[in-house]
A protein has these predicted regions:
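Oxyanion/phosphate-interacting regions
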Residues: 75-82, 96-159
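Short, solvent-exposed secondary-structure boundary motifs
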Residues: 1-2, 23-25, 137
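Glycine/Thr-rich phosphate-binding loops of Rossmann-like dinucleotide-binding domains
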Residues: 1, 72, 118
Length: 159
């Protein structure tokens, strides 16, 4: 919204204890809505996610932030060892995680600051689509939790 593109989202999440159990990500300018409820699946505009499988593509699609491409993120991308050509997709807001949830992208490394309200809704969606969001610190994958005293997220990888 602030960047004057159509990729802003409204995010609504319900967090139970330390994990997301319900999420809605709506992109009003694009009229696209993703939602999920724990145990009931994930959806994009009424269609069950994931919509596509990674094996159907000739490229490995990596989602990255337009405004937050850090040296660490670039190094992470460079270190991905895959037999397919890498394709970088740049899109705004929570749509990055949603692209992975629907199978349009394979991975989203976020090696920079975000807040719990930035990720909770999309995390519920990717979780119900069969994907995951994991913390990523010092080259280690960790459980990604919510309802911490400080609402700043750790770095994470969605896939």
């Amino acid at each position: 919204f602030v960047k004057k593109n159509d990729e802003f989202t409204v995010n609504i999440a319900l967090i139970h204890k330390d994990k997301p159990v319900l999420g809605v990500v709506y992109a009003p300018a694009l009229d696209v809505c993703y939602w999920a409820k724990q145990g009931e699946g994930a959806f994009k505009d009424g269609k069950t996610l994931p919509l596509k499988a990674e094996s159907q593509r000739n490229t490995y699609k990596i989602v990255a932030s337009r405004s937050h491409m850090s040296d660490e993120t670039q190094a992470f991308i460079d270190a991905i060892d895959i037999d397919k050509e890498k394709e970088l997709i740049s899109i705004g807001s929570s749509l990055k995680i949603c692209l992975v949830a629907e199978g349009e992208a394979d991975i989203y490394p976020r090696l920079g600051p975000t807040m719990e309200w930035d990720t909770g809704a999309a995390h519920a969606i990717i979780q119900e689509s069969g994907g995951s969001v994991r913390g990523y610190i010092n080259f280690q994958y960790l459980k990604f939790i919510y309802n911490k005293k400080k609402l700043l997220n750790s770095w994470f990888v969605a896939q």
